[in-house]
């Protein structure tokens, strides 16, 4: 857990610092084509994959909740994450799908905000567990606990921040 602490502190600090900005980042693009949305999703996924772990923030009534995660997958042109249906995070996301993810890689960090949607089909569960085989000891595509969620297209803003370059803002 000690390795998570510096990332968590940086993510929380950047969230507090940059969420107060009232002017948009200079390169805040609108999605103009499906290809641009696909590229933004791929770049976001690759950042999460390279970072190895990220922090998922949800809302529990009036209290924010943050915890480390490590699953990410692009399946059927959507960015997915995975959790256990019996966990508090699942209950929170079913009540309010709005979430934020933060991860750090080198001297950059990414913040992803959007709406997560539950997908109870077997196919994305199989794909997620195949991509993350270490989870197969705890989860199965056929159990009643495995939960996969995807970011609802059109709701996602993904921003790569650094102290050495301007923010890179992507939407998909």
What are these regions (language model features)?
Residues 1-8:
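Bacterial N-terminal signal peptides that target proteins for export
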Residues 18-19:
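C-terminal motif of bacterial Sec signal peptides marking the signal peptidase cleavage site
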Residues 22-36, 111-172:
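Charged, gly/pro-rich active-site loop segments
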Residues 33, 37-49:
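Short, basic/aromatic recognition patches
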Residues 39-41, 83, 89, 132-134:
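Charged, amphipathic alpha-helical segments
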Residues 51-85, 93, 99-103, 111-113:
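Short beta-strand segments
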Residues 94-99, 130-134:
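Short, intrinsically disordered, mixed-charge
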């Amino acid at each position: 857990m000690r390795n998570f602490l510096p990332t968590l502190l940086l993510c929380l600090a950047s969230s507090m610092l940059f969420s107060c900005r009232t002017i948009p980042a200079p390169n805040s693009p609108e999605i103009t084509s499906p290809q641009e949305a696909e590229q933004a999703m791929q770049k976001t996924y690759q950042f999460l994959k390279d970072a190895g772990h990220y922090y998922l923030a949800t809302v529990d009534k009036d209290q924010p909740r943050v915890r480390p995660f490590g699953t990410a997958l692009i399946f059927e042109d959507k960015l997915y994450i995975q959790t256990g249906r019996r966990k508090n995070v699942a209950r929170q996301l079913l009540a309010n799908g709005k979430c934020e993810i933060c991860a750090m890689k080198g001297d950059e960090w990414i913040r992803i905000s959007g709406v997560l949607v539950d997908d109870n089909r077997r196919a994305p569960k199989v794909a997620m567990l195949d991509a993350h085989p270490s989870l197969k000891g705890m989860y199965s595509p056929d159990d009643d606990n495995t939960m996969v969620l995807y970011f609802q297209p059109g709701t996602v803003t993904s921003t790569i921040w650094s102290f050495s370059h301007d923010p890179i803002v992507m939407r998909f």
